[in-house]
Amino acid sequence: AEVAMKGNWVISSVSYPGSDYIKVSSFEIADSQCFVGSTWKFVSNNNKGEMALTKTGCPAFSSPLTWYVNKEGNFVMKVLDAGEKAKRVREGYVLKVANQTENSFQLVDRITVGNSMADVVYQFQKTN
């Protein structure tokens, strides 16, 4: 799974299957919809990468990151410049990988909304 993720990607959509829009701060950085249009680069041989938010009206944010696919097949990511407030920088975020093809894949974050669980689906499209 890791080799297929190397390269440059853009998040083409962020959706909430089975739910309406959910106000969620993705990775303690910005509202999930601010990630639409964001650019991501994954380097597979050293498990490093970088990401940048590009959407107008959203915080300007870019950061190096580290990532790998664990033995359960989940994507583990740490956004290194998310600052002290992002206490999960140390252990990272674990997201499910879904619908992986040569040119696209999804990362699915399971979040708690009130008393129930919801999915946030980040749709990645290859840009080169």
List the predicted regions and their residue ranges:
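Lipid interaction determinants
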Residues: 1-63, 71-128
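Extra-cytoplasmic beta-strand recognition segments
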Residues: 67
